[in-house]
Amino acid sequence: MPVSASLAYKNYDYDYDSIQPYFYFDNDDEDFYHHQQGQTQPPAPSEDIWKKFELLPTPPLSPSRRQSLSTAEQLEMVSEFLGDDVVNQSFICDADYSQSFIKSIIIQDCMWSGFSAAAKLEKVVSERLASLHAARKELMSDSSSNRLNASYLQDVSTSASECIDPSVVFPYPLPESGKSSKVAPSEPMPVLDTPPNSSSSSGSDSEEEEEEEEEEEEEEEEEEIDVVTVEKRQKKNETAVSDSRYPSPLVLKRCHVSTHQHNYAAHPSTRHDQPAVKRLRLEASSNSNSRHVKQRKCTSPRTSDSEDNDKRRTHNVLERQRRNELKLSFFALRDEIPDVANNEKAAKVVILKKATECIHSMQLDEQRLLSIKEQLRRKSEQLKHRLQLLRSSH
């Protein structure tokens, strides 16, 4: 907002209610203008007509809470206000300059003598053109900082166009800043929106020509920016298209893996039904799995997900086979131990303990039998030797 933005860097804590009324109804204000004009020259014949246009701008919005503006930003704001001819002089100038502005020849003679006003306007416009061309050259070297300030100053100018001020047709000389930001060309200029109530025809013609030249230059700059934005959108679209092309084969491969997993689920039921032919069926299933894997390698490229699933399935098959073989070995061991041979519900720990005891007892029996065998062999040797002695004696 131009009013609040111009006041923000001066005082943050001013009250909203302290703003004066926006129409002059008192006689004190009329005396003030009358007194100011009386110091320089007699009142002009247009004084009564001019009283009808004594209006302040529309009321400002809430006080701004922005940070304090630097000197460069203040100069940018003043140059923007001068470029749009919208902001009232009392909000951007001090008290001394406001008095000199009231004494200006443009105000005194704007209704009747158009020659002096036209000369004054041409002088101001020529100075403003020179400053704008110098500022645009500096803007080309520092485009990044100007883009940040452009959005801020664009909001200021758009909200400024909503204010109605009779002083918009009276430009006044102020120190121009070294910078000037561009405004969107799609928005019409404020001077064209508010008709010049008290300016001469020559002054309005010069202002309109000046604004047309500025609009053409700003349109060229905006066209360059539009080209950049179109290229960025095309890059984003290309990246989006390239991202959307890749995940489709992964989904197809995952569906293929899920169907292949379903084929493995049929084998365990046959294993439990007929344990005698488990190894034969496991070998046949492993051969069929290897054939399926070879066919898939030939038809489609393997991905990391499919390889992990194949490894997982192979591990599950081998683990199931190992458990079945272990169970069969426990059953065979249980049948060999007399203590638990008839106990079908014997636990694996009980089977192992009984098997250990049975082994120890069998080892003792073996040693005892070996000692008996040795005794019998010696006895047989003695008997053979005695038999030979008896034969030799006869």
UniProtKB/Swiss-Prot annotation:
Keyword tags: Activator, DNA-binding, Glycoprotein, Nucleus, Transcription, Transcription regulation
Domain of life: Eukaryota
Keyword Transcription regulation: yes
Region Leucine-zipper, annotated ranges: 369-390
Record's GO cellular component terms: nucleus
Name of one Pfam family that matches: HLH
Domain statement: The 9aaTAD motif is a transactivation domain present in a large number of yeast and animal transcription factors.
Name of the featured protein: Transcriptional regulator Myc-1
Species for this entry: Cyprinus carpio (Common carp)
Record gene name: myca
